[in-house]
């Protein structure tokens, strides 16, 4: 019991330190006068619409987790699914290339009784649905507005095309794992043999066999889980619909900012598709939250649309898409740490360890 108290004390200290660091980070990054001025200049109804878009983004991502876990036979209630979503968003926002979210999501689901293998398969399925929605909107947006992009600055277009290509390749890899696992294993084997053929590896006597075996195990496990999880076609349709709704909601924030500053004349779908393309281009930058590329890309893509409100609208957009997610996600991190169910499970383990065991000698 004393050990648990010490652990709780350190957890509380860590949470307080993290809260202070997060507050300092936000204070350093944002100009408070600009923030106040920006929101004071906006129409309240569009501020509410902007917040509503982000809430829809969170809720429909959570619904997607709920449907996917149902299809795998390990259903999560909505609140657990929302916690999984927000933990992923928070840790992705604070790590390079958004790489930190998935491990914490797998850990969270594992705590709820879902095996690590199944949790990984759930994450991959959710990831695939998001990529389908994102790539579909990206291809459509690029087909319609490639001329607008060229007019906004030719230097930006190669990054956007590369970002779209990488998203397509990522989607293709996940799809191959699900539909044609042997193809992906064959391609992966060729790539790994090529990588391990580099002098850096050969000089150390490293062989690709271990990496190839790990790839085979992962792909085969995911394919098995996919076959099981894809039996319920209705849940697949629901999950895919949720992915499109959350993607469109997230990509509508720039339009809410546009209308909030009293601007009109640009159709909704144009502003929305340009935000999709901005997301694809900025995703190449490995900084947390694609910092720098997101702001710079916004200023470049929208400079012909937002006029004198460009800087303020960018600030509002960034506050919603990044800092709001950071704040809400952190609240879920704290709530998850303080969840009474965690304490109950810890007490159960403690009581189980204190139960008297029979003494074989006495018997």
Question: In which residue ranges do the predicted regions lie?
Answer:
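Transmembrane helix-loop-helix hairpins in multi-pass inner-membrane proteins
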Residues: 1-37, 88-203, 287, 291-363
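Membrane-interface helix starts
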Residues: 8-10, 41-50, 227-241
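A short amphipathic helical element positioned immediately N-terminal to and/or at the very start
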Residues: 33-41, 109, 218-230
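Hydrophobic faces of transmembrane alpha-helices in multi-pass small-molecule transporters and flippases
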Residues: 47-51, 86-94, 124, 236-244
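Membrane-embedded helical hairpins/re-entrant loop segments and their flanking transmembrane helices
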Residues: 62-86, 257-274, 298
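Alpha-helical transmembrane segments of multi-pass membrane proteins
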Residues: 79-88, 269-280, 309-319
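Short, membrane-interfacial amphipathic segments enriched in basic
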Residues: 197-222
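Transmembrane helical segments that form the transport core of multi-pass membrane transport proteins
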Residues: 225-277
């Amino acid at each position: 019991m004393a050990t648990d108290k010490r652990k709780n004390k350190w957890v509380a200290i860590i949470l307080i330190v993290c809260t202070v660091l997060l507050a300092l980070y936000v204070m350093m990054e944002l100009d408070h006068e600009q923030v106040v001025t920006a929101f004071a200049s906006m129409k309240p109804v569009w501020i509410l619409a902007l917040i509503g878009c982000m809430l829809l983004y969170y809720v429909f991502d959570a619904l997607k987790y709920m449907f996917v876990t149902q299809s795998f036979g390990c259903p999560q209630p909505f609140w657990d699914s929302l916690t999984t979503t927000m933990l992923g968003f928070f840790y992705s926002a604070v790590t390079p290339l958004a790489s930190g979210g998935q491990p914490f999501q797998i850990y969270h689901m594992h705590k709820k009784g879902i095996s690590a293998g199944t949790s990984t398969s759930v994450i991959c399925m959710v990831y695939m649905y998001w990529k389908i929605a994102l790539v579909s909107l990206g291809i459509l947006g690029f087909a319609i507005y490639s001329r607008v992009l060229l007019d906004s600055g030719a230097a930006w277009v190669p990054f956007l095309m590369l970002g779209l290509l990488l998203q397509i390749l990522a989607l293709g890899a996940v799809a191959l794992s699900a539909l044609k696992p042997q193809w992906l294993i064959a391609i992966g084997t060729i790539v790994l043999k090529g990588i391990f053929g580099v002098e850096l590896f050969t000089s150390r006597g490293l062989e690709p066999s271990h990496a190839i075996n790990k790839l085979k195990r992962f792909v085969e496990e995911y394919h098995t889980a996919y076959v099981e999880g894809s039996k319920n076609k209705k849940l697949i349709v629901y999950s895919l619909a949720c992915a499109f709704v959350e993607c469109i909601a997230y990509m509508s924030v720039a339009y809410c900012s546009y209308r909030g500053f009293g601007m009109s004349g640009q159709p909704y779908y144009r502003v929305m598709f340009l935000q999709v393309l901005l997301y694809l281009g900025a995703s190449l930058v490995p900084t947390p939250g694609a910092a720098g590329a997101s702001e710079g890309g916004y200023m470049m893509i929208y400079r012909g649309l937002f006029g004198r409100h460009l800087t303020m609208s960018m600030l509002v957009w960034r506050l919603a898409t990044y800092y709001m997610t950071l704040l809400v996600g952190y609240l879920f991190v704290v709530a998850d740490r303080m969840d009474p169910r965690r304490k109950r499970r810890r007490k159960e383990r403690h009581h189980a360890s204190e139960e008297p065991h029979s003494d074989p000698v006495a018997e």
